[in-house]
Amino acid sequence: MIPNTLAMPREKPVHWVGSAKKDYQTFPAAVQDEMGYALGLAQLGARHPHAKSWKGEGPGVLEIVEDHRGDTYRAVYTVHFADVVYVLHAFQKKSKSGIKTPQEDVKLIGERLKRARADFESKGTS
């Protein structure tokens, strides 16, 4: 018998913070598919090639951006915490000019990151 030396990584659960899941579910199916793939990679400890660090929150907070029929959709998630992926925010970019994220979305992501941290710490995991 040959031992299995290629152990598959354990899939981390996804926890949705606030209205992130409800908002994500309003995205077009093609956008959900691509973002779902990115989240699936995060669950396995990998990173989607288009995922980029979310500015201001460090390397463990990532953003995936998808364009679809002239609209731009974003999902921000964190892999800061062991054994879980938290989706902090999912939103459609409203501005038609520039790439800057509206301040209200930036603030919401910061607040939800704090909620994710509190949730993680309440479970006694580190």
Stretch-by-stretch model annotation:
Residues 1-72, 81-84, 94-126:
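Basic, Lys/Arg-enriched alpha-helical interface segments
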Residues 75-77:
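Hydrophobic/aromatic beta-strand elements that line small-molecule binding cavities or substrate pockets
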Residues 86-90:
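Conserved catalytic cores of phosphodiester-cleaving nucleases, focusing on short active-site segments
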